[in-house]
Amino acid sequence: MWNDLAVYIIRCSGPGTRVVEVGAGRFLYVSDYIRKHSKVDLVLTDIKPSHGGIVRDDITSPRMEIYRGAALIYSIRPPAEIHSSLMRVADAVGARLIIKPLTGEDIVTERKMKLVNYGRTYFYEYIAEVRSR
């Protein structure tokens, strides 16, 4: 299941593409797989980093320089109260958003996200509207 999510993220991202995981915590299987099997510019964030390779950030009050230039933002099992913040940041930087919720949990966002079944996993995806600059 986790391999399938990582493969999907890799397929959506070319070499050098900036990808940000929000709420990395201690579960690093997906990020480790992405690092091992691709050349994306992967940044891990968490409000309470579990090690030095994770950048401290609170998605509800984000440091936007972390997310600028990101083509894809993803979060694995984020609490419902940050779903809308994830979407706001994705919109602000024009990034694709992937949320892998806990089983049975609803997505709580202002706009509808598409349910994607990929391999042995499922997740919700939102493609931000490109804003003119």
UniProtKB/Swiss-Prot annotation:
Family per UniProt?
Belongs to the UPF0146 family.
UniProt cross-references to Pfam families, sorted A to Z: UPF0146
What name appears for this protein in its UniProt entry?
UPF0146 protein MTH_1000
Q: Which cysteines are joined by disulfide bonds?
A: none
Output the superkingdom of the source species. Archaea
Give the species this sequence originates from. Methanothermobacter thermautotrophicus (strain ATCC 29096 / DSM 1053 / JCM 10044 / NBRC 100330 / Delta H)
Which InterPro entries would you find in this protein's record?
Answer: SAM-dependent_MTases_sf (IPR029063), UPF0146 (IPR005353)
Coiled-coil ranges (or none): none
